[in-house]
Amino acid sequence: MKAVVLTLAVLFLTGSQARHFWQQDDPQSSWDRVKDFATVYVDAIKDSGRDYVTQFEASALGKQLNLKLLDNWDSLTSTFAKVREQLGPVTREFWDNLEKETESLRQEMNKDLQEVKQKVQPYLDEFQKKWQEELQIYRQKVAPLGEELREGARQKVQELQDKLTPLAEEMRDRARAHVETLRQQLAPYSDELRQRMAARFEMLKEGGGSLVQYHAKASEQLKALGEKAKPALEDLRQGLLPVLENLKVSILAAIDEASKKLNAQ
């Protein structure tokens, strides 16, 4: 039964993701996706790192050393936050320029994707319709068994399970058949889309000039990004210096204190 439940869960999840992929009306821009990912990642590191620092300072060794790491950590995260704010507009400009330079290529690829999407959409709709019908049939078959369980005694649980197992296996087999049918129907269109994408890149490769042009423009944008990021990175370096110096002084003081205690013994 666990295998049946897992199979159905995979089918539900796969179906929902596929529908989201084909019917997404308002996709995020490249910059928004990168920004969201970076924000989540940095915040996770910041929170987990602060937890570790707090735990260390609360330990016996941390209290003995008294490094004041938490104060340094807060200063460090504040410095990183300022740098991130400074780099935000610069990075946004980089992505905007890169998207502008590759607009023509992306439009052609999106056109190919939309054409293939229109061809496969009827198959996806038909699959969803059949899947809903199968679920309805399964619910109708299971409903009387649920009523039996409510009215019966505990000894009927095993009997109910014996009745449910073949129904679940039947639904699993029918679902597999529908998935296999959908896979066979979509296979030619997947190949078509793959061939179209390959043809687009082959045209770029044969054109030579276009490919070199894309590379040159990307290199130019990266160079401009590096130049504009220099002030923010310098601010980061200047902000880190007092933090590192403070940490260095605390560590040396702790070592000196430990040495004095050892000599006194």
Swiss-Prot record:
Annotated tissue distribution: Major protein of plasma HDL, also found in chylomicrons.
Annotated compartments: Secreted
InterPro entries reported for this sequence: ApoA_E (IPR000074), Apolipoprotein_A1/A4/E (IPR050163)
Gene Ontology MF, one: cholesterol transfer activity
SUPFAM superfamilies, A to Z: Apolipoprotein A-I (SSF58113)
Start and stop residues of the Sequence repeats: 67-88, 89-110, 111-121, 122-142, 144-165, 166-187, 188-209, 210-230, 231-241, 242-265
Membrane-spanning ranges: none
Post-translational modification: Glycosylated. Palmitoylated.
Main location group: secreted
Gene Ontology annotations for the cellular component aspect, listed alphabetically: chylomicron; extracellular vesicle; high-density lipoprotein particle; low-density lipoprotein particle; very-low-density lipoprotein particle
Lipid metabolism as UniProt keyword: yes
Alphabetical GO biological process terms: acylglycerol homeostasis; cholesterol efflux; cholesterol metabolic process; lipoprotein metabolic process; phospholipid efflux; positive regulation of cholesterol efflux; positive regulation of phagocytosis; positive regulation of phospholipid efflux
Keywords: Cholesterol metabolism, Glycoprotein, HDL, Lipid metabolism, Lipid transport, Lipoprotein, Oxidation, Palmitate, Phosphoprotein, Repeat, Secreted, Signal, Steroid metabolism, Sterol metabolism, Transport
Leader sequence residues: 1-18
Methionine sulfoxide PTM positions: 109
Region (10 X approximate tandem repeats): 67-265
Oligomer and partners: Homodimer. Interacts with APOA1BP and CLU. Component of a sperm activating protein complex (SPAP), consisting of APOA1, an immunoglobulin heavy chain, an immunoglobulin light chain and albumin. Interacts with NDRG1. Interacts with SCGB3A2. Interacts with NAXE and YJEFN3.
Role according to the record: Participates in the reverse transport of cholesterol from tissues to the liver for excretion by promoting cholesterol efflux from tissues and by acting as a cofactor for the lecithin cholesterol acyltransferase (LCAT). As part of the SPAP complex, activates spermatozoa motility.
Homology family: Belongs to the apolipoprotein A1/A4/E family.
Protein's recorded name: Apolipoprotein A-I
Native organism: Balaenoptera acutorostrata scammoni
